[in-house]
Amino acid sequence: MEMDEKSDILPRVLEAAKKRRLYLPHALRQMNRPNRMISTGEVRLVIEDGEVIEDYPEDVRGHSCLMLGHGESGRPVHVVCAPKNDYLAIITAYIPGEKEWSDGFSVRRKP
């Protein structure tokens, strides 16, 4: 994917996040798993300081993207989000695994 395609959604993500962040039930369940415990502050850091690593323009929930950033302790965190007119939908958040991701957790490994 070209960088232009991925960077196209970032300004919309940031603008929507300024208005409101809405955590979908799935995101809250994933964030609160005992082996993850991802805080809303960590999600905010990923959105504000992270990078778009995958873009999903055809997502049935609306155009969304996968962002990589680092949480409060420096651990890598992935956040899938979708900008809407009045808010940013947080679809899920998780700690990426080395088996599934390479290049600093920014490139999905081929199966």
Q: Predicted segment positions?
A:
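Ribonuclease/tRNase effector modules and their secretory precursors
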Residues: 1-111
